[in-house]
From Swiss-Prot:
One GO cellular component, as annotated: plasma membrane
Organism: Stenotrophomonas maltophilia (strain R551-3)
Name of the protein in its database record: Tetraacyldisaccharide 4'-kinase
Highest taxon in the source lineage: Bacteria
Summary of the function given for this chain in its UniProt record: Transfers the gamma-phosphate of ATP to the 4'-position of a tetraacyldisaccharide 1-phosphate intermediate (termed DS-1-P) to form tetraacyldisaccharide 1,4'-bis-phosphate (lipid IVA).
NCBIfam families attached to this UniProt entry: lpxK
GO biological process, one term: lipopolysaccharide core region biosynthetic process
Lineage: Bacteria, Pseudomonadati, Pseudomonadota, Gammaproteobacteria, Lysobacterales
Length: 339
């Protein structure tokens, strides 16, 4: 049996009627969320401030919006600028969730969580998973990090932050605009205006269409794919190698259609296989009855490495943002650098 992932209710985004039970529960969720936030704002509950800068990359909707590609790009930029970044994450869906853990590139995703393992695999920086992000930040500082990047955690108010980056999907935005469970919102849409940076994930949009899709004060993020890395090891192939071929495309992410569309844009014949987000794969899940190449996202690949073979490929995703975004971010961060 395949491990179950998380499915997004269709009525969050497709305009279909919201069940009455969900409508009745949404105000309760909204009230609890507002009360908790007010408690931190008014000092009834205390923030904890770490002695190094803290950057939170998050969203106000449930599910994926492109936070992890941005986190990876951010870590690489910070390292190039002379910082020693570390990443703190909750590690959604992992086993022994109450147990803090250092995540390595070879940590099983069941133990470390999909996104933390992917970040460790791609960047090599210290990655700490812990329900308590304050404790995770302290551990990263002890490990020598001088800036903390939180992958998700916009709503984890106990940890004070210096920079907030909201990531929103350009296609789905805020869905039906309702709070969980009637809609995708963790917090009201107005919360987004309080973030220091709003990044709009445009997928494979080009520079011209990116500029048109983003409003004032929003930064476009384009996603690019160029190659495919065999899971069994060996030299990567350019995606042009698969042009004109049929392939099985596997995506267990929040918005799998985006991955399929990106492959099709490269002239690849896609046989799509959409799985739930955070799917725990078993070998039989990828037995499609043919020897066509299997191309998958890197988030899926880290969960399939144990049974990878010569025709399973991970397709690296690269996030690209305007140079002005990085200038604005590093300028803000440099002001926080200790003398």
């Amino acid at each position: 049996m395949a491990g179950k992932g998380t499915q997004t209710p269709p009525y969050w985004y497709d305009g279909s009627p919201v069940p009455w039970a969900m409508r009745l529960l949404a105000p309760l969720y909204a009230g609890v969320t507002a009360l908790r936030r007010r408690a931190y704002r008014r000092g009834w509950r205390k923030h904890y401030t770490l002695p190094v800068p803290v950057i939170v990359v998050g969203n106000i909707t449930a599910g994926g919006t492109g936070k992890t590609p941005l986190t990876i790009a951010l870590v690489e930029r910070l390292r190039a600028a002379g910082w020693k970044p570390g990443v703190a994450s909750r590690g959604y869906g992992r086993e022994d969730a109450d147990k803090p853990l250092w995540v390595q590139a070879d940590t099983p995703t069941a133990k470390g969580g999909d996104e933390p393992v992917l970040i460790a695999w791609k960047t090599g920086v210290p990655v700490r998973v812990d329900r308590d992000r304050v404790a995770a930040g302290k551990a990263l500082i002890e490990a020598g990090c001088d800036v903390i990047v939180c992958d998700d955690g916009l709503q984890h108010y106990r940890l004070a932050r210096d920079i907030e980056i909201e990531v929103v999907d350009a296609q789905r935005r805020y869905g039906n605009g309702r709070m969980i469970p009637a809609g995708p919102l963790r917090e009201p849409v107005s919360r987004a205006s309080e973030c220091d940076f709003r990044v709009v994930n445009l997928g494979q949009a080009d520079e011209e269409s990116a500029a048109q899709a983003c409003g004032f004060g929003q930064w476009p993020m384009a996603l690019h794919i160029d190659s495919a890395q065999p899971l069994a090891g060996g030299r990567a192939r350019p995606l042009a190698y698969f042009k004109g071929q049929r392939v099985h495309a596997v995506a267990g992410i929040a918005h799998p259609q985006r991955f399929f569309d990106m492959l099709r844009a490269r002239g690849i014949g896609v046989v799509p296989h959409a799985f739930a987000d955070h799917q725990a794969y078993q070998p039989q899940d990828l037995s499609f009855g043919s020897q066509l190449p299997v191309l998958m996202t890197e988030k899926d690949a880290v969960k399939c490495r144990a049974f990878g073979n010569d025709w399973y490929y991970a397709v690296p995703l690269r996030a690209e943002l305007p140079a002005a975004f990085w200038v604005a971010l590093t300028d803000r961060l440099d002001k926080l650098r200790p003398n």
